[in-house]
Amino acid sequence: MSSRFLRTAVARATQQRSMYENPYINRFKARSKVSEDFHKKTTGITGLFVNEHPHRALTVVYGRILRALEQIPRDAAYRKYTEAVVKQRLALVQAENDIKKLEEKIGMGQIEEVIEQAEYELETTRAIVDSKAWEPLVESAPKGQWSWPV
């Protein structure tokens, strides 16, 4: 009985893939399909797929960023400035229904790029919360470390 499982495992491990078979394309093929009536078929950027529901995606990510920022003290510079930008963009997302106009108002490229930037910002916010970057240093900085030029 165990030999049957062993044979299938060995067969899978030694199975050769043709040079024309791209696992990346097979994995993401479903994400690359866009409905016929959508205004664009591709972003023109390799690996960045068209998002047919950007308002929903941005609302979710911006909400997560704002919830993560609540864990940082109000007087921390990162929280103040990031919260201002995220709230401004969230207001734009909620106010503007047209995707092309929203891209113009945000001014950071295609809406898919804005979604990707928001996801990176969420990762950054979570990393700052984990590291507690707003707390004072464990030991004081050496004299002259922050003076420039030397």
Swiss-Prot record:
One of its GO terms (biological process) is mitochondrial electron transport, NADH to ubiquinone. Disulfide bonds: none annotated. GO terms for cellular component: mitochondrial inner membrane; respiratory chain complex I. It is found in: Mitochondrion inner membrane. Keywords: Electron transport, Membrane, Mitochondrion, Mitochondrion inner membrane, Respiratory chain, Transport. InterPro entries: NDUFA5 (IPR006806). It is a peripheral membrane protein. Accessory subunit of the mitochondrial membrane respiratory chain NADH dehydrogenase (Complex I), that is believed not to be involved in catalysis. Complex I functions in the transfer of electrons from NADH to the respiratory chain. The immediate electron acceptor for the enzyme is believed to be ubiquinone. Complex I is composed of 45 different subunits. Belongs to the complex I NDUFA5 subunit family. PANTHER family: NADH DEHYDROGENASE [UBIQUINONE] 1 ALPHA SUBCOMPLEX SUBUNIT 5 (PTHR12653:SF0), NADH-UBIQUINONE OXIDOREDUCTASE 13 KD-B SUBUNIT (PTHR12653). This is Probable NADH dehydrogenase [ubiquinone] 1 alpha subcomplex subunit 5.
